[in-house]
Amino acid sequence: MKRVAAVIEYDGSNFFGYQGQPDVRTVQGVIEDALERIFKQRIYTQAAGRTDTGVHANGQLIAFNCPNDRMTTEDIRNAMNANLPDDVYVKEVFEVPVNFHPRFDVTKRIYHYFILTSRQKNVFLRKYVWWFPYELDLDAMRKAVKYLEGTHDFTSFKTGSDERDPVRTIYRIRILRLKNDLVLIRVEGRSFLRRMVRNIVAALVKVGLKQWEPEKMKEVLEARDRSAAAGTAPAHGLYFYKVLF
């Protein structure tokens, strides 16, 4: 029995997050249902990240044991895509070592967050960007991210229900202005706490609006208190973009 990994993209709009749950539609659920139709047995998958309700993915990585050694990786990809709904797509399948685990063996996770700052709403993008019709000072936001890069206790930027070790490493945060008033916030790190990226984005927007000075980010981080930070940016602007391993 060989082990394979698959790079998956999905539109998170109509899912209750990635992780499988009873009685609701999840990304893991539809993937494992598709694999069961292909292999006539339940196949359990592991993923590099568990995205929340409404969050999208360009490069989610999953792994599973394939019970049919005669199928090529291209056969598996084609069979999965033939059995998956239109809002999930397998971009690539490849073999990995038998002990490979996407959650633990990934060395970098990259998230993208999109903010549309135009005064007019774009109804076609409403599920895929955060429409925020205010001018943002990107230079101030770029100064603020320097306080977040590196290894820190990110208690101020996690949800209260996340009991994991709050110490995380952010390798880099980039803020880019794209065309048509679209702002991209790219966050690179080894691993993240629940809603950590969205909470960071909300805090950066405070800086961009000049409600906070860039130095406020250091104060919030050192407070180690969720109530010291801003709110949470909407889920639909966030994309699990890519992993490296």
Swiss-Prot record:
Its EC number is 5.4.99.12. It catalyses: uridine(38/39/40) in tRNA = pseudouridine(38/39/40) in tRNA. It is an enzyme of class 5 (isomerase). The keyword Transmembrane helix does not apply. One of its GO terms (molecular function) is tRNA pseudouridine(38-40) synthase activity. It holds the Pfam family PseudoU_synth_1. Substrate binds at residue 111. GO terms for biological process: tRNA pseudouridine synthesis. The keyword Mitochondrion does not apply. The active site is at 52 (nucleophile). It comes from the Bacteria. Keywords: Isomerase, tRNA processing. Formation of pseudouridine at positions 38, 39 and 40 in the anticodon stem and loop of transfer RNAs. Homodimer. Belongs to the tRNA pseudouridine synthase TruA family. This is tRNA pseudouridine synthase A.
